[in-house]
């Protein structure tokens, strides 16, 4: 997620090169004005289409690896309407983007229409509690989406679990039942403590 590309076409050029150098496989750049907002919140503003196109063209030209994927995101649906979002997606694809990302469709009809009307591969953003209706991933594949991202899947679950644990502790004065939780060893193993312990053992000074 490269947001707006962090500036104009000059900044986008540098952003793409830095991301590619870091080993990133794909990048998405959007048409919001900076400072941007979450695509599922109100109050967004768009840059003009010609500025958006300039960024996409610069991004496509800046990559060295032809397999580095440029994803063009448009937030137009919430600002100027669904038709403009489709137009912006198709214009971005015609100017070098590999995948179109129409952010925040509001109805199942819009979700269904996007891969039919966009002239290239489409990405679906599934935000828990967001504007877009909940959708089974098998149905999304059948509609024609090539990629789906679920950016709030784990954060939402973590927030709910934390809220419940704190509420239970407040009401009972007891910590959660450890029988239902990972052990200390399991928690350290999840974050590869064994790897760091090997380094400690190998290089420990006596």
Model-assigned labels for residue ranges:
Residues 169-206:
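Flexible C-terminal active-site loop/helix
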Residues 2-168, 196, 202-206:
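Alpha/beta enzyme core
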């Amino acid at each position: 997620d490269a947001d707006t590309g962090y500036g104009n076409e000059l900044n986008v050029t540098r952003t793409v090169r830095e991301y590619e150098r870091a080993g990133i496989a794909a990048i998405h750049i959007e048409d919001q004005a900076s400072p941007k907002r979450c695509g599922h919140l109100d109050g967004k503003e768009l840059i003009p289409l010609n500025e958006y196109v300039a960024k996409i063209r610069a991004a496509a030209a800046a990559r060295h690896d032809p397999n580095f994927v440029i994803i063009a995101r448009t937030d137009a649906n919430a600002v100027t309407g669904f038709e403009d979002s489709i137009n912006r997606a198709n214009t971005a694809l015609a100017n070098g983007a590999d995948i179109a990302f129409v952010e925040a469709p509001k109805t199942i009809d819009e979700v269904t229409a996007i891969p039919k009307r966009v002239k290239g591969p489409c990405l679906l953003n599934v935000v828990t509690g967001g504007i877009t209706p909940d959708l089974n991933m098998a149905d999304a594949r059948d509609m024609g989406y090539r990629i789906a991202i679920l950016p709030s899947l784990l954060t939402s679950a973590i927030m709910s679990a934390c809220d419940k644990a704190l509420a239970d502790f407040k009401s009972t004065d007891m910590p959660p039942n450890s029988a239902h939780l990972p052990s200390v060893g399991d928690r350290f193993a999840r974050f590869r403590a064994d790897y760091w312990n090997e380094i400690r053992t190998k290089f420990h000074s006596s």
